[in-house]
Amino acid sequence: MMQISSNGITRLKREEGERLKAYSDSRGIPTIGVGHTGKVDGNSVASGMTITAEKSSELLKEDLQWVEDAISSLVRVPLNQNQYDALCSLIFNIGKSAFAGSTVLRQLNLKNYQAAADAFLLWKKAGKDPDILLPRRRRERALFLS
């Protein structure tokens, strides 16, 4: 089974941001590392909590398990490592159910790799900003096509 590469992890950290000190996310949820909201060594994320970069990477690998499971269960065509890494970044951001109903997945499973790549650009809206994620999607699309 494929897994995200170290290059994919580095890119995902750059896209999502990594914070080694706990903070409240845009919805007020205590968060640490790369968007981690679960427990850290059995403790809930709380104000003042800090972690090492190594712990952040460990948490991210655990948090990516559902993403990798989504790819394994939904994608029915061969992928190269860059395509896999780009999909990990997209799915980590939009969620499994959104990906499951996406044009990206539909085109991919038809072996229309170019159309699948172009469909990344449809996932550009967040909150009230219709284009805020477009630069990220362009980078993911470029990785997918490389």
From Swiss-Prot:
Any Gene Ontology CC annotation: host cell cytoplasm
Keywords: Antimicrobial, Bacteriolytic enzyme, Cytolysis, Glycosidase, Host cell lysis by virus, Host cytoplasm, Hydrolase, Viral release from host cell
Localisation per UniProt entry: Host cytoplasm
First-level EC class: hydrolase
The keyword Hydrolase is assigned to this record: yes
GO biological process, one term: viral release from host cell by cytolysis
Family annotation (SUPFAM superfamilies): Lysozyme-like
EC number: 3.2.1.17
MF terms in GO: lysozyme activity
Main location: host cell
Active site positions, chain numbering: E16, D25
Catalysed reactions listed for this entry: Hydrolysis of (1->4)-beta-linkages between N-acetylmuramic acid and N-acetyl-D-glucosamine residues in a peptidoglycan and between N-acetyl-D-glucosamine residues in chitodextrins
InterPro entries: Bacteriophage_GH24, Endolysin_autolysin, Endolysin_T4_type, Glyco_hydro_24, Lysozyme-like_dom_sf, Lysozyme_dom_sf
Superkingdom of source: Viruses
Keyword Hydrolase: yes
Pfam families assigned: Phage_lysozyme
UniProt record similarity statement: Belongs to the glycosyl hydrolase 24 family.
Function of the molecule: Endolysin with lysozyme activity that degrades host peptidoglycans and participates with the holin and spanin proteins in the sequential events which lead to the programmed host cell lysis releasing the mature viral particles. Once the holin has permeabilized the host cell membrane, the endolysin can reach the periplasm and break down the peptidoglycan layer.
Protein name stated in the entry: Endolysin
